[in-house]
């Protein structure tokens, strides 16, 4: 890696160091760039290693941190003009709480963002093929779920011990002083204490929680996603004969067979059925396996030990957070109840002498809509009560009739597009019935009339718009798990404040 030194003013706002670019416009901390010499000093220790910089990536000097904190607190510098600006004032609200902790927190956020994200980008780009083929959640559900026998469902732990984060960063940041600084900041801010790892509006700009959360999830993805190919190469040959060994061990007492362990005794056809499939959505991940129950239990134990000792997990709850081993018939995910239904096909086999008809069995991905999801979602938005009885939307009474009907039609379009993958269309018909009754109740409450008088008019108008919206629905003969469609629908769900 080429090492460049010089004045930051001469190099311009875009500083180039090998393949790593620093653009000051991308950072949210203008106070830290008042002393550019101190900023580039934070990168000096890493660059001083020369060609071995990648081996110790992220080794930073805390001398620059102290200088930056001192420059911010320097009374001789006039920071009042900077505080008067609206943008900087919004970023420095924390100064009212702690004049020392706030610049310390901003500097910690800056170093973590620079030290961790380029490494994440480099690792993900080198393994992009594996990430694209396995980590796509919808392809995982379509292609892998129906072929699996057991599903491991787990949530990322919400409460971590603070030392767990320190141990994670210790592998990337070799500066012991900075790690002690992180410990102080984490304990002061109580990072991850009682917080979920994904909240749409939880993270604020400039918060140290954002790089910590992203790096933590990236570490779990790297541990669970990347090594499976290497596990198959180096470990599956040792894991595959486990079931065979148990069977043969029982046969030893019934016969004089003597089992000999060698490479030729490995059944590679048996090894091919031991694939592990991994998928994650927000803070919940699924691991599907095609192996036997014994192999899955062994892999579950191996995974638990791996995560426990790799991340040094210390959770408030004594219950293991990764212990749900489910069959492919009762998995709740993305607002669906995921099923792998058995299907049979008649196959005609023609031979020289005769024609035979045989039955070929298989599994098909069969997502269903649970009643609890519909009732809970509609009750949250005040379209029905928690027993499923439709009620009027009182917040929409002040709107015009057209806006009320348009609101219900838009809600139906979102539901029908998202739940179009369901095989039980009866639940969709029940959903439109609930929305129709709620629409009638809303219009009746607005005009202070009975539902019966308005039903004819509202039914005609709403049904015409619903029929017109059918062109947006995907055909049942095609795959409906489209990431672009689901992404657009999730945006609508976020706007409507409907959680999945």
From Swiss-Prot:
UniProt keywords (A-Z) are:
Chloroplast, mRNA processing, Plastid, RNA-binding, tRNA processing
GO MF terms listed in the record are: RNA binding
Q: Which GO terms describe its biological process?
A: mRNA processing; RNA splicing; tRNA processing
Give me the Gene Ontology terms describing cellular component: chloroplast
Compartment list:
Plastid, Chloroplast
Keyword Plastid included in the entry's annotation: yes
The parts of the chain that form a coiled coil are none
Q: Does the keyword RNA-binding apply?
A: yes
Q: Which domain of life is it from?
A: Eukaryota
Family that this chain belongs to? Belongs to the intron maturase 2 family. MatK subfamily.
Role noted for this protein: Usually encoded in the trnK tRNA gene intron. Probably assists in splicing its own and other chloroplast group II introns.
| PANTHER family noted in UniProt | MATURASE K (PTHR34811:SF1)
Entry protein name? Maturase K
């Amino acid at each position: 890696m080429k090492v460049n030194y010089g004045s930051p003013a001469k190099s311009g706002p875009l500083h180039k160091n090998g393949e790593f670019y620093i653009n000051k416009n991308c950072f949210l901390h203008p106070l830290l760039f008042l002393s550019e010499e101190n900023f580039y000093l934070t990168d000096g220790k890493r660059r001083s290693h020369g060609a071995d910089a990648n081996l110790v990536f992220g080794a930073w000097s805390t001398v620059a941190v102290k200088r930056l904190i001192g420059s911010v607190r320097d009374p001789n510098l006039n920071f009042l003009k900077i505080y008067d600006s609206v943008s900087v004032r919004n970023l420095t609200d924390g100064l009212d709480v702690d004049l020392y902790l706030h610049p310390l927190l901003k500097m910690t956020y800056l170093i973590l963002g620079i030290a961790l994200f380029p490494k994440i980008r480099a690792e993900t780009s080198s393994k992009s093929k594996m990430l694209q083929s396995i980590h796509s959640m919808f392809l995982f559900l379509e292609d892998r779920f129906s072929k699996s026998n057991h599903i491991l469902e787990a949530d990322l732990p919400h409460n971590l011990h603070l030392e767990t984060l320190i141990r994670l960063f210790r592998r990337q940041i070799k500066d012991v002083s900075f790690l002690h600084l992180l410990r102080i900041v984490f304990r002061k801010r109580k990072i991850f204490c009682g917080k979920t790892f994904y909240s749409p509006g939880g993270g604020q700009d400039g918060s140290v929680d954002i790089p910590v959360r992203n790096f933590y999830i990236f570490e779990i993805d790297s541990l669970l996603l990347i090594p499976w190919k290497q596990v198959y190469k180096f470990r599956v040959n040792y894991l595959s004969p486990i079931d065979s060994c148990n069977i043969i061990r029982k046969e030893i007492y019934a016969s004089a067979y003597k089992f000999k362990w060698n490479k030729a005794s490995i059944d590679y056809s048996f090894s091919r059925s031991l694939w592990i499939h991994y998928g994650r959505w927000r803070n919940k991940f699924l691991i599907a396996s095609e192996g036997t129950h014994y192999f899955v239990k062994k892999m579950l134990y191996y995974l638990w030990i791996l995560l426990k000792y790799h991340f040094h997990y210390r959770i408030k709850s004594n219950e293991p957070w990764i212990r749900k081993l489910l069959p492919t018939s009762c998995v709740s995910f993305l607002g669906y109840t995921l099923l792998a239904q058995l299907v049979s096909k008649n196959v005609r086999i023609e031979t020289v002498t005769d024609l035979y008809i045989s039955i070929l069995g298989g599994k098909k991905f069969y997502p269903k809509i649970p009643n609890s999801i519909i009732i809970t979602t509609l009750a949250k938005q005040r379209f029905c009560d928690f027993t499923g009885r439709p009620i009027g939307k009182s917040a929409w009474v002040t709107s015009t009739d057209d806006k009320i009907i348009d609101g219900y039609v838009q809600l139906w379009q979102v539901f029908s597009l998202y739940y179009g993958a369901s095989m039980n269309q009866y639940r969709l018909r029940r959903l439109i019935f609930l929305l129709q009754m709620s629409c009638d109740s809303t219009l009746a409450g607005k005009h202070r009339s009975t539902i019966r008088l308005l039903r004819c008019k509202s039914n005609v108008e709403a049904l015409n718009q619903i029929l017109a919206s059918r062109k947006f629905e995907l055909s049942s003969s095609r795959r409906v798990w489209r990431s672009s469609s689901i992404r657009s629908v999730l945006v609508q769900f976020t706007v409507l404040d409907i959680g999945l």
